[in-house]
């Protein structure tokens, strides 16, 4: 049988004409990639995979319960004969429906739409329906068995959170018009969850690649003699299956141990050779051969490896000393069963019973078959394959010990995976489902069998017991726990009073603008908080940009300060996350390939002596081949032609160890790259002919030579077709023009950075490229917003990625139908005169402002900016700020309404109740501080006084800034409780102290609003909107902003919009000519007049349009915090902190330094004592105990000294007094020592 070979023949690469292809045309390839997958399509796809495959697979395959317990019932003679009862049940059907909620007014269930969930504080969850089969078997002492069976029909168990936009969402496949009708943003991508009315995003989490050996040197610590360890997590399937971990350690004593981490196995470091002996390989030579492969080889590596292994076999282990030299596998298994088994409470008690010992040993082997390297098989006939694979793992560790190979690079994405919401929620679901569903069912059956005789059981009894176990409480446990796993985010949650570590990393979705929303959905977090929080070299390396990042992780975007620097990252613009592929079909194809010898047909000696390469699929060793490079290339061509393998299949040849790896597991990062073809075969043949002709003496031998040519088949016409919508990325893949490459396979590629570099080496046979890249693909969406980012200091681009997410704009198009807390809606947003490719996917969030770079009056020093008052009056950066007020009726005695002062007590003093109509201020009413905006009263139970029937619980508006009531709603909550919802609107014009930023990360603060008459102007009468300090640019190296201003000036005068995406070429000469055509200087500088004096400035001023964005840092929100009064803590009397509690700003260490340097010590005393919790305390000088003082009645008293007391007054703090009280409550007394009285002579 001949191996399958590629069939498609592509045209000669020499005939491809793409000389007209420009760098700007290459941007269309990025557009094709984004249009194909969507910016967050991978997240929705991951959740859809969980719904369609993950949850059914987990419930049906992983929760097949089979337990046997001793029967405790002894009411009758039959009960006494019954020894044990076996409970077996499995779920036969799992179905998750679209979200619903109960309509209490009609008594039925209706569809729950996303906006309804937001407004009513509901969770957007779909019903989970299960069907099951139950078998109960009674075992009697006389050998008889009695079986009871029952089929549980489908019924709702609980609900499961549904992702907005997934195939279980009501908005799935809806048209834009239909989305508008239900109050949804027609352009919103989805990808988030709605839990208890809030929007939450499940982050992408970094994880190590499963079925891969990760070798690391271990830090020598006290009491730890470990030198190096190899960690291997084995997972069959590659998506939602359970995994098992083994840790192989090499100790300073020379011992090699294996630790199996499993819930069915106690953690114990087992000598490596005992695992081989337990599986039937008893001879030391045969065991060592599994590691070194060829005992007869005389190589230095082989000899040294044998010495290490022989020494490890003879190292004394105190725990396993009784079986260290034991060759009888039954005794070894029995010894291990006594040490590590968890399924038997006292294994040593079975020693006297041979049948019990045999059962225990077989059970132990069965468990080992399932938990030891399960990806290599889980049955007894795969034990030899597992031993060979285990030997290979030890072989690789020894090579690292001998410094033949380096340890695993922990930061490389070659050995990492990125798990989306589907995998993260699957991990949480497994633990929660086991605790909240499986455990109650088992307990319910035990209780049933305890109360009812087995022979009296009916099918109805079994169904009722099954259903009763999954009652309302159980359903709420599952639903509440899944919601908590999303809301809490990576913390321990409690499920039925049991702590469960939550593996889901989430963040609240702050809708500041569309860029912020998309960036939150493309966040990749490194889940390693233990090492990240330490000041170590490892913590520093984790935060650096790794060489495997470009094209997959944005090299510019991350947090700019704090612990999240380098730990929270963003996907690059074309990067995508793969779901699991079909492994079985590819495995069958590989095993049927004649070029691959199956593992059972290859001996260890043949691998070394014949130089065979190992072949893996998802980490499973399936065989060997003679030519690894040819095998990898052949299957890559088959992938290119769309045969045999999935287009996202990873095919990687590791030349260091000569292994071919095929990967189809979940979480692989991938990105499309344009393929570069060449004529190397024709070139080699021509060179051979020329060499032969030269040998024969042919003087014209050079005519046989042909030039080497390499090029991509992507043309400018294809770029135009992509922009026209007639050509997609899938079409390019089908035509063999591009393919998907993962970080592993990228190591086998030589990628040209740009089409310019490819053309530069078009005929260079020594630099044969495999692919050509688009330079902009190394950046993420937020970094691509910055124009000419390659000309700006990288740190500034990083600042822009964070500032761009904080800018004001249109956070969504469905804002009239939403009630959001702290949302800013900017009125006027313009497309930049110098746009980038990012603006094709996000709506603009700023204005084209006329900026003059100059010093003018001293109000624009450092980061301060002078703003034209005319610009503010025209609505520059003006917008609306929204807040919400939400009040719930806590019980039946509460109601909304205007309190009647005649029968209501506890009315708020000084409050204005006159604006209330039916309990709410009408829409359009202006409310001020002291106005009651929501009226609520509670009836006093048992009150007989007709004048005090109600108590006031109304909500008073407490801000100094006036607001307009924009919307009033009275929705119903999840339990039909009524609550009032009010949206307040504020006019937020640009104020002194507000922040703004350019797209190059140059932030400024409005320091002065200058009247139009005082603003400088040009000869043409042009006045700037902003005056920016020019000294901020040389040190910050924001050259991109200078170029943007110059290009923007030419664009404004000529009425065009140009593309300023990073890495596009900048023609300085052409730009100067464009400015000259409009009568300006070549550098854009102009002569300007002083608006206050009318005189010319001595120097030409650089002025032009620059795109600026207003940051959502409003000075009006912080005014309440700068005052000498405010809310204080009821216990300590200290000022509160935070906006939610209307608290103050912290007077920190640097603020103290500033005040001290200015000699304002009294200010420090006033702020830290008088305006805080300062107070006067009284202490007895004699005993040091607190004294009693009453100012109204001059009483001075000490409980210890009585009339002998000598009481002094001390400046103290309430927090200090509270601390003393707490210490005395703990039986620890604190006394004070006061200085003695000093009497001055008269």
From Swiss-Prot:
Q: What is this protein called?
A: DNA-directed RNA polymerase RPB2 homolog
Give the UniProt subcellular location, in the record's own words.
Answer: Host cytoplasm; Virion
Q: Which GO terms of the molecular function aspect are on file? A: DNA binding; DNA-directed RNA polymerase activity; ribonucleoside binding; zinc ion binding
Q: What is its main location?
A: host cell
Keyword set includes Phosphoprotein: no
- Write out the entry's keywords from A to Z: DNA-directed RNA polymerase, Host cytoplasm, Late protein, Metal-binding, Nucleotidyltransferase, Transcription, Transferase, Viral transcription, Virion, Zinc, Zinc-finger
EC no.?
2.7.7.6
Q: Which organism is it from?
A: African swine fever virus (isolate Tick/South Africa/Pretoriuskop Pr4/1996)
